[in-house]
Amino acid sequence: MFAAPTKTAQKHYSYVPNYGHALAPYVLSLALYVGALVFNFAYPIRKVSRADGTATQWFLSKVAIGGAVALGTAVLEATLMMATGLKVDNIGLFYLTAILFSFTSMYLIMFLSMAFDNPGRFVAMVGLMLQLGGAGGTFPMEITNQFYNAIHPFLPMTYSIMNFRNALTGGIANSTVNLGFMVLIAFTIGSLLLLLSLIHI
């Protein structure tokens, strides 16, 4: 054994230059969610501007404004992060993940704010707290407690972090990335449908 020691073979699926890059997917997702939360605290989502306006006009106006803010926030954040030195392996995937998760956060929080007013915003804040621990952004889920492991698959931020990681460093299977996109799209469409249902109540 000592005369001919075993040689290990190492294979790298991705490369992360430092701890900041490793934590970036978590911080990017957190910033987009908080941005949507702040917007829905400041924007009068329940206010009707025109008494003679239709429910459809109200819905489209709220969705359009929220969508524009979400899009602008995502593009600005992604651009500034790259401009300040964040190394991105797949720029298209990076922007797409930022935009999609920004829409998901915006419309989910918008629905909660519209449906329940301030209690709904509080629920959105609780959702943020749960995602901080349960999305797997700081520590591997294998060393996280059972509660967070149980809710992990149901949190939108789980999938944005996963796709951001692949955009930054690669190494994640395409099928897993596609699943992340499908889940975020499902959250976005579901939130819009729930928001649309409110105008008929």
Task: Report the location of each language-model feature.
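Membrane-spanning alpha-helical segments of multipass transporters and channels
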Residues: 1-199
